[in-house]
Design a protein with these regions (language model features):
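PLP-dependent aminotransferase class I/II
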Residues: 23-100, 104-107
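Short acidic/glycine-enriched loop/turn segments that link adjacent beta-strands
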Residues: 38, 110, 144-147
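PLP-dependent enzyme catalytic core of the Aspartate aminotransferase-like
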Residues: 129-133, 138, 142-170
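Conserved PLP-binding catalytic core of the aspartate aminotransferase-like
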Residues: 89, 99-133, 149
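Active-site pre-lysine segment of PLP-dependent enzymes
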Residues: 4-33
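Short beta-strand-to-loop capping motifs
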Residues: 46, 116-120, 153-155
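Walker B beta-strand of ABC/ABC-like P-loop ATPase nucleotide-binding domains
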Residues: 1
């Protein structure tokens, strides 16, 4: 099972592998690129025999009518989807470069967020400064990794505010 929750923001995906191998399944969600996190609506791409096996055990009412209507409307508006996706990609690139200018090491992202660590100081005080100013990012400190920040791509205004606050702290 390949989880492609962020595939719409990536340069490549694994959908074609489904045709090559009957045991490969790809799951997608409308939570990220379609902005429907609250609906918890997704889908599975697999060969027909795999789908048939899932249908044998699925609940008769596994999706409610509101979620189906929301998902149908979202999928039907590909212009909005493409505009939103392109905006996220542009803003992600701007965030990436802005963080690098402030001394961060930024891992190239294939999602709607970036992961960064600062080359000369810990991330925790930066995280606290952002939180104190009502800018919420995720602080992570995993064994074997430098502590770092996971920053979601927001609007241009949100990214400007985030970068300005970070600049005050570094």
């Amino acid at each position: 099972l390949v989880d492609e929750a962020y595939a719409d923001f990536a340069e490549f995906n694994c959908i074609d592998l489904v045709e090559e191998n009957p045991k490969i399944m790809v799951s997608r969600t409308l939570s990220k690129s379609y902005g429907l996190a609250g609906l918890r609506f997704g889908f599975l791409v697999a060969q027909p025999q795999m789908i048939a096996e899932f249908c044998k055990v699925k609940d008769s009412y596994n999706c409610d009518a509101i979620s189906i209507a929301g998902a149908t409307a979202a999928i039907g508006d590909q212009q909005w989807f493409n505009n939103n996706r392109n905006k996220v990609l542009e803003t992600r690139q701007r965030l990436h470069h802005g963080l690098e200018k402030l001394g961060f090491d930024v891992i190239p992202s294939q999602a709607n967020f970036v992961w960064c660590t600062h080359s000369s100081q810990p991330s925790k005080p930066i995280y606290e400064h952002l939180k104190d100013n009502r800018v919420l990012v995720r602080y992570m400190d995993y064994e074997g990794w430098s502590d770092g920040l996971r920053i979601s791509v927001g609007t241009d205004e949100q990214i400007d505010a985030c970068l300005s606050l970070i600049e005050m702290k570094v």
